[in-house]
């Protein structure tokens, strides 16, 4: 199959497997959920009454003081006491094998092509790390909510996009399924397309 370049009068021959496969919603959902879960720290921790440092002695006698009866100072009703159902550190990570991950990426890329949300250009760069210059360039291409994918990290492009809302710059190695579906359009250079094919082959 062919992808037409927006800034050149030629088409790019690409693999049907990478850019023309059916959309597997269940697979994409599973991989996106796993990706988000793997980003979680899961390091929160609270103490139960058993883990609180302090005496187990009864604070005052049962009867005769006029105060409410109390058996200890570490209960959840007390200031500084334990938490009833204390949160514990946990591992939220989910295993996704390479074949599934690659399959999800190819499924997303194919759907972007079908929906005409994948914009392929010969090359894309800015001369200086200026947000104004990048904004004007994107406006000329009628792009606003866009993920820019280049073959290698372009520092000028990265710095220029850093202060733009709904614009992100990634190299092929930094591609992930969540970023691909988070933006309205995905702008990819011809070199990046070739790298993506090699990566997912």
From Swiss-Prot:
- Family per UniProt? Belongs to the universal ribosomal protein uL4 family.
Q: What's the subunit arrangement here?
A: Part of the 50S ribosomal subunit.
Q: Give the originating organism.
A: Shewanella amazonensis (strain ATCC BAA-1098 / SB2B)
Coding gene? rplD
| Pfam families per the UniProt record, alphabetical | Ribosomal_L4
| Highest taxon above the source species | Bacteria
Q: Which GO terms describe its molecular function?
A: rRNA binding; structural constituent of ribosome
Query: What name does this protein carry?
Result: Large ribosomal subunit protein uL4
Which key words tag this protein in UniProt?
Ribonucleoprotein, Ribosomal protein, RNA-binding, rRNA-binding
InterPro entries reported in the protein's UniProt record? Ribosomal_uL4, Ribosomal_uL4-like, Ribosomal_uL4_dom_sf
Functional summary from the UniProt entry: One of the primary rRNA binding proteins, this protein initially binds near the 5'-end of the 23S rRNA. It is important during the early stages of 50S assembly. It makes multiple contacts with different domains of the 23S rRNA in the assembled 50S subunit and ribosome.
* GO CC field: ribonucleoprotein complex; ribosome
Q: Where is this region: Disordered?
A: 46-71
A Gene Ontology biological process term? translation
């Amino acid at each position: 199959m062919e992808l037409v370049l927006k800034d050149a009068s030629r088409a790019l021959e690409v693999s049907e497997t990478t850019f023309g496969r059916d959309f597997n919603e269940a697979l994409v959902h599973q991989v996106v959920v796993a990706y988000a879960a793997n980003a979680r720290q899961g390091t929160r921790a609270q103490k139960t009454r058993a883990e609180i440092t302090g005496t187990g002695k009864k604070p005052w006698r049962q009867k005769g003081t006029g105060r409410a009866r109390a058996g200890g100072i570490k209960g959840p009703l007390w200031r500084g006491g334990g938490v009833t159902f204390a949160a514990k550190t946990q591992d939220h990570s989910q295993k996704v094998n390479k074949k599934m991950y690659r399959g999800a990426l190819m499924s997303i890329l194919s759907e972007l092509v079908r929906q005409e949300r994948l914009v392929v250009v010969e090359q894309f760069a800015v001369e200086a790390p200026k947000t104004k210059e990048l904004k004007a360039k994107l406006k000329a291409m009628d792009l606003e909510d866009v993920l820019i994918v280049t073959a290698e990290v372009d520092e000028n492009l990265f710095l220029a996009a850093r202060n733009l809302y709904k614009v992100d710059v990634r190299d092929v190695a930094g591609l992930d399924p969540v970023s691909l579906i988070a933006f309205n359009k995905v702008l990819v250079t011809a070199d990046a397309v070739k790298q993506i094919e090699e990566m997912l082959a």
